[in-house]
Amino acid sequence: MWYSRAVNPAKLLEFLRSHRLAVQASISPNAGPQAAVVGFAISDQFEIIFDTLETTRKAQNLRNNPHIALVIGGLTAGDERTVQYEGIADEPTGADLQRLKQIYYSAYPDGPSRAAWPGLIYIRAKPTWVRYSDYNQNPPEIVELRAEDLTA
C-alpha cells in the first residue's frame, strides 16, 4: 500500500460532496458502540453537519461523549474509495448554526421543512483525523490527514 500525506484537500472535498450518506458511530454511556446512517453535508472547513432528533441514541451519546467517527463511500459497485473520519461533535449555535444550516439545506432542500419538528437538533463534527482510501488503484492510495492538513 502507498501511504501519503499529499492529497489535495479540494479533491477530498469533491469526493465527500459526491456522497449524501455516512455511517456515523458514537459511544453509548455504558461504553458500547452505536452506529446509524445519517444524511450529511460538508463545509469548506471539512465540518460535517447533520440533523437528528434530540431523543435519538446518537444525540444522547454525543452529548455524553463528543467523539464521533463516520465512514463515507465504499458502497457503490466498482468504486472502492472510502473516507474514515474522526472528530469532535457539538451542537452549533448562533451564526455558526445559521451558516451550517445553509450548507445543509443546499444539500437537502427538504431540510427547512424538518426544522419545525419538535426536538430537531443539528450536530457538527470537526475533524481530528481523516483517512482517504482508493482501492481502485494498484497499489491502493491511502492518505491520512490531521485537522491541520485540511485547508481547502
Task: Please place each PLM-identified region on the residue numbering.
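Charged, gly/pro-rich active-site loop segments
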Residues: 2-7, 79-152
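Short secondary-structure boundary/capping segments
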Residues: 13-14, 40, 60, 112-115, ...
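Alpha-helix boundary recognition
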Residues: 16-17, 63-64, 105
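Short, basic/aromatic recognition patches
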Residues: 2-22
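AMP-binding (ANL) adenylation modules
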Residues: 76
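Generic structural signal for secondary-structure transition and capping sites
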Residues: 20-21, 67, 109, 130
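Short beta-strand segments
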Residues: 19-54, 60-62, 68-73, 81-85
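A generic "binding-loop/recognition-motif" signal
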Residues: 54-55, 128
